[in-house]
């Protein structure tokens, strides 16, 4: 299965409240700002941009689905402060498990460990996540640290070691502070809870340079049975396909066969986390782990072609896209989210590649930060995407402002276009770029953020 990529660590930055609103243009998503109970003193929650569909947002994050508990505690892994830095998501039963991982050749020890576990086991019981040290480029000792951590969690939960998955985020080249981690595990396991607070504390514990935590839970009905999907993610910098700098944990109480579940996760990742970019860096640690408890009561989904599978896939896509957009919205130093929508391509893959090319362009990102409607940079990034199309069929719009039609530039009010960009930045809202390359049936989206002076400052001082 072809997977993703993930991230790094930074000492906590005091959170500056970010007002959020959608631009006046109607968008197919609902904006919900989540609260983070007892953890809000450390970090607030990201806005959730949930696509419209036959589902509703519910409380609970990764604990919303039946059978799941979570916890996040401070264990001394971070350089300073008492922000939670160790999280655990556990299932009461053997859950069908799937994963997607970084494409970076220098994959971190926990990534290598998880890939090995998933190659030999179809089920999982828990995911342990630490922040502070990435445990990447740490050799054999780093890998043993991951094994020892999994073994310790397994003993406390009274399950097999190969049912424990590990994720790490932090500074590359640093092994985990294993003694502090192992000493904290009894307290972490004792803190496991199916409450909203349990989910929120875990979502905060996995953050690094993030200014907001990312957590969501959705309920839908399939075959007359209520199904829940929950998720949490982290990521703010070192984000670029494949699988942008990020960690993610997904939970559901649907019953899905192993092969179908793994293919569903692969498809959803390709439409979400692989479609976000902040800075063009593919992390060593990117990892998404997804667990299905099967406790909802719905008969198992055994085929991708069934109506139930298609309904479930759409909801899974929506959850992952919501988390992905929250990551891009929270890009290091960003003032706005960029959403690129491409239509008219030959197929979904080609549309997605064009959208990624535009969202990844440093010149496009810098122009948006400068509130400069320099649409030529958009056209340029479409052209070098590697996808062949008829340039005389190219249409480009910025928000509701048409800039190019059938390959011909259109007159437009630059002050109005600049104000559109400024309003989005002032409100930490969304800049929409719409592109059509023909009359094909392929559609795709990608998400990014603008490129500001603050991004350079954050990363220039990362380990100092």
Curated annotation (Swiss-Prot):
Site entry (Cleavage), positions: 244-245
SUPFAM superfamilies: DmpA/ArgJ-like
Domain of life: Eukaryota
EC numbers for this chain: 2.3.1.35, 2.3.1.1
Signal sequence extent: none
Site (Involved in the stabilization of negative charge on the oxyanion by the formation of the oxyanion hole): 169-170
Quaternary state and interactors: Heterodimer of an alpha and a beta chain.
Descriptive protein name: Arginine biosynthesis bifunctional protein ArgJ, chloroplastic
